[in-house]
Design a protein with these regions (language model features):
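Active-site-proximal alpha-helix that buttresses catalytic centers in soluble enzyme cores
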Residues: 1-275
Length: 275
């Protein structure tokens, strides 16, 4: 029997977020009706990951995160480690996060096309809006996505962040206008609607076309299954989820955050699932 697929989202106080994630998981189930697929959350919503892991004996945990930061490096392995400590017989593998990935970038381009932004229109300047993190490598990954989008279109593309990093969306819009962009569009590097995507909308101040979050797209559903299947081909280290690993995870995070002995959280959440 194949292990269950446990898709874990961050969780949000905004009900639109959980509704979107639930719709996304329905898409995944439609693609693989024979697979046991379950949804869990790290925070703010139920069921929590540790609760869901009490109901399975074997599972692949797929983080519904668009990049690596505090939630992927500390919160998630901590929750899994606690579940394994409580039930040592659990056979749990943690898959890689969803992004960055070319399939997500293609969805972001489609969302822009839906609001009338043509890849051939050099008059557009595009802001790629993401959550933001106190971890520089996470923000650099978003910047790399923006660079790839600019390479495959005729746009100027700059990254922007809703919190914890700069430039802000407002600053990015001003930069594009100063560089000669005649029209502005904002691409969403969020998986679902929520408070931080709403902050992006406010910062755009009615001056830009606003693309929707990636959402319950078929390509995102296929990517979730790709992450699940990848663990069965030996591409993901199993020791991520062992109880003794969590100390190493925290120490590594502390070093990256520049605060020895104390992990530093991102502002509200990270990588696409807003509170």
């Amino acid at each position: 029997m194949r292990p269950a697929l446990v898709a874990v989202a961050h969780g949000s106080r905004d009900p639109r977020s959980a509704a979107t994630i639930s719709s996304l998981l329905d898409r995944v189930r439609s693609l693989r009706p024979d697979l046991d697929i379950r949804l869990a959350f790290l925070d703010l919503c139920t069921p929590r990951l540790e609760t869901v892991l009490t109901t399975v004996s074997r599972a692949v945990v797929v983080p519904l995160l668009l990049g690596r930061a505090f939630h992927a490096d500390v919160d998630l392995p901590g929750a899994v480690a606690r579940a394994v400590a409580a039930r040592p017989e659990l056979d749990i593998t943690v898959a890689d996060v969803l992004g960055p990935d070319a399939r997500l970038e293609a969805v972001a381009l489609r969302r822009l096309a839906e609001v009338g932004v043509s890849t051939a229109d050099s008059g557009f300047g595009v802001v790629l809006a993401a959550a933001g993190s106190r971890q520089a490598p996470s923000n650099a990954a978003v910047s790399a996505v923006a660079h790839r989008l600019s390479q495959h279109t005729r746009w100027q593309v700059v990254p922007a962040f809703a919190c914890a990093a700069r430039p802000t969306v407002s600053d990015a819009i001003a930069t594009l206008q100063a560089q000669g962009a005649h029209r502005i569009a904002v691409a969403s590097w969020f998986l679902a609607p929520g408070l931080l995507p709403d902050k992006v909308v406010r910062q755009a101040c009615g001056t830009a076309l606003l693309a929707a979050p990636l959402g319950a797209d078929a390509a995102v559903a296929e990517l979730i299954l790709h992450r699940y299947d990848g663990t069965n081909q030996g591409r993901v280290a199993r020791d991520r989820c062992r109880p003794e690993s969590i100390t190493a995870y925290r120490q590594a995070h502390d070093r990256r955050a520049g605060a020895p002995g104390r992990a530093v959280r991102d502002c509200h959440h990270h990588a696409g699932l807003p509170r």
